[in-house]
Amino acid sequence: MLNNFNKFVASSVSMVYLAVLSWATAYAYGWGQAAYHGYPWWHVVQGGSMIARSLAYVCVVSMVFVIGYLIGYQAFKFIKRFFGLLHVSWGASHLGFVKIFILLVIVSTPIMLLLYFYVGILSSYRLMGCVLSILAISLVCHKFGRAISFSIRLRELMSNEKYYQIFMAFIFVYVVVSAFSIGYLRSAFFTGYDIIEVENRPYYILVANGDEEFILGENIKHNSHFIFFNRKTLNHYTIHITPSPYLPYKNQLSAQIYHQE
């Protein structure tokens, strides 16, 4: 009876974790778009469809991590065995570099894949820049972090409660931060913005805000105002971006509703 209750509690906590993570991912993605286009982040609204896509994103990232770990683990075993057969001292002393490189490849792969799916463009020079960055970070971490020993197997991670909680916290932070980054980068790389006319003036459809609204702007970036257009009722209101009198820096902005129809 107690085991069944513990399983029920564990499954309930897992469901709550997935729900909170999906909600946070959806809003982090929207905040990334807001950061690029320049409208206030507190106007971001996400509908049920975006929450569902965020849940799918969480599942995909988890699968990529597991598959990447298994592939990386087998690749590391092969490299270690290869250098052992050749009796190469360089390989034995630099296996830590290989570990860090494989780990960074696993961490960066979901972002690269989702950027490709969302934007549709992943140029060779950007991919090469990513690989070179991973190599540089791996070299620096290996050079200055030799005193730190870090080795956790997948079975040990899932069975040890402390490691499992740290892993789940890492997944939460990673997914939320990557969702924010993808929202920002997708807006920066996206080239297919639609145009709609409001009051006989053309506006870019920057993002879909929730299930009913479009956020419109005269430019992709650096707009002085934004129109929130309800595509069901065809009503809209305008947000003007003005310098806040309570902040010492002119580049810090506040928003106010200008008019509503």
From Swiss-Prot:
Protein name (database record)? Protein TfpB
Q: Which organism is it from?
A: Moraxella bovis
